[in-house]
Amino acid sequence: MALRAPTLLLLLLGLLLLPLLPGLPPRATGCPAACRCYSATVECGALRLRVVPPGIPPGTQTLFLQDNSIAHLEQGSLAPLAALRHLYLHNNTLRALESGAFRAQPRLLELALTGNRLRGLRGGAFVGLVQLRVLYLAGNQLAKLLDFTFLHLPRLQELHLQENSIELLEDQALAGLSSLALLDLSRNQLGTISKEALQPLSSLQVLRLTENPWRCDCALHWLGSWIKEGGRRLLSSRDKKITCAEPPRLALQSLLEVSGGSLICIPPSVNVEPPEFTANLGEDLQVACQASGYPQPLVVWRKVPQPRDGKPQAQAQLEGGAPGLGGHGTRDTGSGMLFLTNITLAHAGKYECEAANAGGKARVPFHLLVNASRQQSQQLPDPQAPATRPVGHEPQHEAGSMAFRALGLATQTAITAAIALLALTALLLAAMICRRRRRRKKVPAPSGEGTLFVNDYSDGPCTFAQLEELRDDHGHEMFVIDRSKPLFPEVLPEEAPEHNPPDGLKSGLRLPTRVAYEIHC
């Protein structure tokens, strides 16, 4: 029994010291609900979370948030977690990353974003991650990697981009990744990749490019030569078999087996119909730039600025599909539509459509004129139909001026001639009217005009038959007056006008003018 007492004492002491052992950390206080927390690790996976839960201990170094429904990562949601080194956000529903979302995690070494719904990456999405070593972006919906996307990751060693929909990798997309050792671009939609895109990767040791629809043309000639010369060491035996998908004559052939003479390109040709168009104020306009070539050219619209004070200005690219007169132009494969909405005089001027592929570049100008007044909308002709020039040439301005001097010389001359012609016509009409009035004044009035002849023919009312007989030899009508009323006012003999009626009217009486008489029949 004496030996058993110390043994029991040691067992009790061991149970008291067991929570203090480093292998079994105690449960931390302040752990988010339903999460499991340890001294430096917090597990919140598969809890149907929609946001990062509050209350995570500030000293957390490893955070598991996988298999949830987090769709938005706000900029300040991770701000208290400055000590974080491993963050697992895979299999969520993230659609975008705000600029500076990880600014407060300068010690982060590993970031897992696999299996989300990211469609694009902003240039400042990874600002602050100066110590990041591994970045998982596989299994998203990325389609383009723009220039300087990973510029703020100088110590990144592994970049996993497989199983996306990447079809465009810009020349400076991987700029700044001087420490990158592994790049996985397999199972994407890449048709080509430029030599300039891989130049910043001075520490690259593993490159995965398989299962992409490679277009074997002149733009990919460098890749075959690079693999044969020194890039072979970066590729596994599987990755060396880069299979062509285009053109059809080279389909399913390995790039390394295709001769350099078969990797050809067709320079682009470009056409805009009509080359000049007249638009009205306030209307919308769509202009198609048809480009052809192999590979399919990339099309960009630019507005050629008017020089000021003899100094040419830089060209402004236009967004294909978006209105405006500046900004960054977007590339469009083939359709090449220029969209202008609510046209003003500032839209007038010269535009340029540029098509480019690995075989070269081609440009074509387009001239836009704007009517000063609103008119009925004009429709552009169908690009497939024969070219027709726009109808109607009203006062047009190529700049913002509304002055008469802004018009062309031919337009000014036409307006001046029209005004002079109208003035001459008005003078001729006035002269003709005056001449006719003078002729009317000179013509004498016919004899007997304005004279009323009265005949005392009946002693009473007359019939219509008698009225037909009351006409003199010259056809004048003879009217019958009432004898019961005086015929004339009393007129002095010296005031009576002298009048000799014509022959055949001796029995008639001439009534004085400006005197009213009552005549009964």
Curated annotation (Swiss-Prot):
Residues 212-267 form the LRRCT domain. This is Leucine-rich repeat-containing protein 24. The keyword Membrane applies. Keywords: Disulfide bond, Glycoprotein, Immunoglobulin domain, Leucine-rich repeat, Membrane, Repeat, Signal, Transmembrane, Transmembrane helix. It is a single-pass membrane protein. Disulfide bonds join 289-353. LRR repeats lie at residues 59-80, 83-104, 107-128, 131-152, 155-176, 179-200.
